[in-house]
Regions:
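Residue-level recognition of short, well-ordered coil/turn positions
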Residues: 76-77, 122, 139
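Conserved GNAT acetyl-CoA-binding A-motif
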Residues: 136-143
Length: 143
């Protein structure tokens, strides 16, 4: 895994994996994110809370980005989108959430993958990259 840092305009950090890369979501990802979530809605429903009626709108996405940014700034959580390196296709997302410092040094790990990309080992690779980030970059002890 290679962790590289870019200027803020290019969404840092970028975690490079063999077939994928992880990076924080940006405004320009909305359309691809909304399309992937829409075609994967039934597939994701058993594991996710009910979606509000406006879940896939641009304004809901912007609120989501604002929450991600605040969590990142406060060291409470770290959201990443997962992209396939060969074509930069968005395949899913991971979130390191509920970060607790002090003695615990722990977080929760959430993830989702779009239906078209399931059963390809992408999430296994992304989880490995996310855990490496949690332990090596965030200095957590438990995930």
């Amino acid at each position: 895994m290679v962790l590289t840092f870019f200027p803020a305009s290019k969404a840092e950090p970028k975690i490079m994996l063999p077939r994928l890369y992880l990076r924080p979501p940006v405004r320009g990802d909305w359309k691809e994110w909304a399309e992937l979530r829409a075609v994967s809605r039934d597939f994701l429903a058993p594991w996710e809370p009910l979606w509000p009626d406006d879940a896939l709108t641009r304004s809901a996405y912007r609120r989501r980005l604002a929450a991600y940014s605040e969590d990142w700034a406060r060291d409470h959580g770290y959201a990443f989108f997962i992209f396939r390196r060969q074509d930069d296709a968005l395949v899913g997302g991971i979130t390191l959430a509920n970060v607790r410092r002090g003695v615990a040094q722990t977080c929760s790990f959430g993830y989702w993958i779009g239906r078209p990309y399931s059963r390809n080992g992408f999430m296994t690779e992304a989880v490995h990259g996310g855990c490496t980030f949690a332990f090596d970059e965030m200095n957590l002890h438990r995930v």
